[in-house]
Amino acid sequence: MQICLMDETGATDGALSVLAARWGLEHDEDNPMALVLTPQYLELRKRDEPKLGGIFVDFVGGAMAHRRKFGGGRGEAVAKAVGIKGDYLPDVVDATAGLGRDAFVLASVGCRVRMLERNPVVAALLDDGLTRGYADADIGGWLQERLQLIHASSLTALTDITPRPQVVYLDPMFPHRQKSALVKKEMRVFQSLVGPDLDADGLLEPARQLATKRVVVKRPDYAPPLADVATPNAIVTKGHRFDIYAGTPLTE
């Protein structure tokens, strides 16, 4: 994959070349998207809109730390949607990991989560965030046990994952409506890189075959059901809904 590769003064010498080789990235000086290695973290920038700032994954501080400490925890919609109740903490495959936020919420309340991400730039951002998170004295211990990254396309990987999870979580990128042009700055940068998941409909059936309990699909409130498969089971929040589908139970 081609992207502009940059490092800032103070970044570890040679680290950018190692990173590019690991994730199969090629430097393209004219690419409007840039992957920048700073002394603190790896971040994604939209070069033609510098005011949007950079995107990076931070499980330790910022919004993620605030959500972990002061958010709803088990009361969050995503936790309810995957079925967390009492001592039941399902094993989850997040098949569209993105920036890892929902996966982190689930891990922080006790679920084991395997994140799948096919875009090598996004996978590199997630890996950078995980590396720093694993090294953190406060969260590193449980984060290493509960949150892992698999760099692969869900369209193929969902048929190969073992052991089977109880829940598969899907949050495919969906085009924003025109009147929502003032989408969060962060999402504008992110969508410029990955675009909408035009093949997302193909995820529902393999997800249902893989999950032993349920599949949860996060959708904007205006979006049709994934693959146009309606379900009466959903948790509705302001602006979103979590559609819930039955999985395929284990056979003895």
From Swiss-Prot:
Binding site for S-adenosyl-L-methionine: 101-102, 117-118, 153-154, 171
Record keyword Ubl conjugation present: no
GO cellular component: cytoplasm
Family affiliation: Belongs to the methyltransferase superfamily. RsmJ family.
Name of the coding gene: rsmJ
Subcellular locations according to the entry: Cytoplasm
Protein name, UniProt field: Ribosomal RNA small subunit methyltransferase J
SUPFAM superfamilies for this protein: S-adenosyl-L-methionine-dependent methyltransferases
Organism of derivation: Salmonella paratyphi B (strain ATCC BAA-1250 / SPB7)
